[in-house]
Amino acid sequence: MDHLALPIRSPPTSERNQQSRNFFTSYALPSAAEAINGPVREPIRDFAPIADRLIVGVDFGTTFSGVAAVYTSNPDDVEIIKTWPGGNGITSDKVPTEISYELPPDAPAGTKPTVKWGFQFRPEESRLRCIKLFLDRSQKLPFYVSPLETAAQLRKFNKTVVDAVSDYLTQVYNHTMDTLTRRYGESFMASTKVDFVLTCPAVWSDHAKNTTLQAAERAGMGAKSSIQMISEPEAAAVYTLKAIQPNHLNVGDNFIVCDGGGGTVDLIAYKIISLKPLKVEESAVGTGGLCGSAFLNYRFEEHVKTRLGKTRFEEMKTKKGKTWQMGLRYFEEFVKRNFNEDEHHEINIPFPGLADDEEVGLDSGFLVMTAAQVKDIFEPVVKEVCDLVQGQVDGLRAKGGIVSGIILVGGFGQSDYLYRRLKSFFTSAAPPPYSERPTHASANSIGDHAAIEVMQPVYAWTAVVRGAVLRGLEGNMVISRKARMHYGTSYATVFDEEKHSVSERYWSPLWERWMVSDRMQWHIAKGEAISPLTPIAFHYTRNFRPGQSLVVTDDLIACEADEPPVAYTRDLVHVCKLTTDLNAVPRSLFTRLTTTRGVEFDNLDFTLEMIVDSAGLGFELKVDGVRYGRVDADFQ
C-alpha cells in the first residue's frame, strides 16, 4: 500500500551524482529564482476558440464532489448536475465522495467487484471516505479517517488509492456523459468535443497533482496533457469576482479566497492587476487546515452521545438508524447552514421514536438544543478558520499590502454563523467614508485593524465547479503564482579546499580535476512569483564517452525550509526523476574533447526549460535555443 506511506525521500546520493562519480558529466549554471507548482504537462495552452464544444468542470472534493457543464455557444448557461444514482429523486448540487467494492460470496477467483458510490449506500454500510486525501502523502488525515481500515478495504479487493480514485471518477464521468446525452441528444454528443477541467486543493503536492491527473485520464476524461487543472480557491475566485458585481475591489487590492469544504479549508490570496479584463496574481502562498464542516458533524455526534448516554446513543444508531440519520440530516442541512445565535435561541433536532426525557431534553421526538450549545459545537472549528484567514492577512499586511476582501465559498462557506464570525472578526474598525476611496498610503495608515469586507456569493457550494468551467471558457485569469517550496537539482563542481571537506572530493578522469558532488543549485525560491508565460531555464554541461547512452536522468529536489541547504541532505524531498533523451540532438552540436591521456569524449551544453501553469509543469529540451523534444518526469 505505497499510496498510504509517508513521502518518499531521496536516496543518500541522487542518481545523477552516482553517474557523476563515474565520469563527471554535469554542471548547472545559476538560473533565475522562480517557482514550480504541479505535475508534468505540456506547455500551457488555452482552449482553442472553436464552436461546438462542451466544457465540463469536475470538483473532486474530500467529502462531496460536483459537476458543471457549459456549451461554448451559450456561455452564460452553466448547468449544475443535480440528479445522482441512488438519490431517490432528490436533487443535490453535489454527490458524496464515497465508494465501496462488493463481491458475491461464491464469486470465482478473478471476478471483478461491483462498485457502489455516492448516494447508493444505506447508512450502516461500510464505504471508503476521504480517499482524495490519501493521494497526497504530505496531508494530515482527519481523526475520523482510519488509514489502517482504508488500507484493509483496498487490500481486500487488490486495489490501490489511485485505483479507488480512478474508479470513483469513472462513475462520475459515466453519469456526467449520460446526463449530457439526455440533455443534448446522442447525435450532438457524438459530434461535439468535450473538454474537462479538474480542480485540486491549493496545497496539493506535485506528486498528488500528477496522480490526480492520471486517475482522471484512466476515468476517461482525456489525456493527461489535455485535461485542464485549476486550484479550488482559484476557481472560486474566477466565479465569485464575476458573480459579485459591482464590488468594492480595485486594482492593487488583495483579497483572500476561503474555500471551506467538508474535510479541509483552503486559502489563497490574490492581488488585482486589472479589472477589464480581470487579471490577478497570487500574492501569498496558499495555506490550509483540517477544519472543514465534517468536524461539526462529529462534534454534534459527541454532543448527542453525551446528552443521551453512550448506551442509548449506540442503540439508536444500530436499531433506529433512520432516527439518527434524520437528526443528522437536519443538523447538516439546516443548523450548519443557517444557525444564527441572535435569531435562533432554541434549536429542535428531530429524533422521531425516542421517548420523552425531560432531564435529557427530549420532547415529542425532538432534542432541544440552546443557542449556547450549538455555538459550543461551532466555535472551536470556526476559530481555526478565523486563525487561518488571520495568518494570510498578517502576511500580506507585513509586506505593505492592502487586504480589502475575504471571499467565502464552499459547503462550509454557506454557513451563516461562519460568515457572521468572520465579518465581526475582520470588520471591527469603522469603514472609510464611502465618497472617498482611500489611497494605498492612507489605507495602510489605518493599521492592522482596518476593516475587511466579507463576501459570500449566492452559489457558495458550487462556486468552485462554476469557476472551473469559466476557466475552460475564458482561459487563465491568474498571471502569476507563488512557489510552495524551493526547487532545485544537485550537481558536481570543482573542489575548493576553502569550501569543501577533503573527504568529499573525488577525481574526475575526464575533467582531470578534483571534484565534489551533491551540491545543490536552487533554481526556484520558496515564495517567489512565477508566470506560465515565462519558462525557467536549467543549464547543463554533460560529457559522454564513446558508446555511452545519451538518455540521462536528473533528480528534481524540493526543500520546505525557509533557508535551503547548499549541499544535499537526507531530509530534502525527492519530487520526480527527469529523463532526457539527447539522441534527437544533432551530433554536430556535440563538442569532441580529449584528455591529456588521449581519452576522447563528447561534451554537450543544453538547457531544460520548465513551463508552469495553475497546477502543472512541463519540461522541454533545448540546445542553442532550438527545441529538441519533451522531457519525461516520473513523480515519486
For the regions a protein language model found, what residue spans apply to each?
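Phosphate/ATP-binding catalytic cores across multiple sugar-kinase/actin-like superfamilies
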Residues: D167-S187, A235-P246, V251, K375-V403, ...
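Phosphate-binding loop and its immediate beta->loop->alpha context
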Residues: S14, F23, S73-E217, G292-E343
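Glycine-rich phosphate-binding loop plus the immediately following alpha-helix
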Residues: K94-P104, S126, I272-T318, L362-C386, ...
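Gly/charged contiguous loops adjacent to phosphate- or pyrophosphate-bearing nucleotide/cofactor binding elements
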Residues: L135, Q153-T160, F188, P201-V203, ...
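Glycine-rich phosphate-binding/hydrolytic loop that grips phosphoryl groups
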Residues: E98, I227-P246, N297-E302, P380-K383, ...
